[in-house]
């Protein structure tokens, strides 16, 4: 796992990156409330057999600070715009559609974003009852 900073028009986001095969699909994983991207290390590193995996730290979690665009009235809506900006940058970087996944609110954010920018998304997966620290594949 490697930490990266990805710059977007809504600020800088700290993301975890697990490298998979050279031409593997790109998966972005969005964490649940109270977690950060690195929480899912045990799960996501195993997915590198088939994917290049990114997992962000949403604003105010992990290593991403609440930026100028942080929406304290409706943080879920604000985070959906932040995630959209991040996915647009990943799409530009890799020049292909991104598969979105997430746990709990991260899954909901991923579904919201997939509707905003469906032309940049290859699909989405949402998990509600995942205990990431105990997950084994």
Placement of each model-derived feature along the sequence:
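Active-site acidic short loop of glycosyltransferases
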Residues: 22-23, 49, 94-96, 119
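An N-terminal hydrophobic leader/cap segment in hydrolases
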Residues: 1-4, 16
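Active-site loop/oxyanion-hole signature of alpha/beta-hydrolase fold enzymes
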Residues: 58-101
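Conserved HGGG/HGGXW glycine-rich cap/lid loop of the alpha/beta-hydrolase fold
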Residues: 18-66
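Conserved small/polar residues in nucleotide/adenosyl-binding loops
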Residues: 128-135
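Conserved hydrolase catalytic core segment
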Residues: 99-127
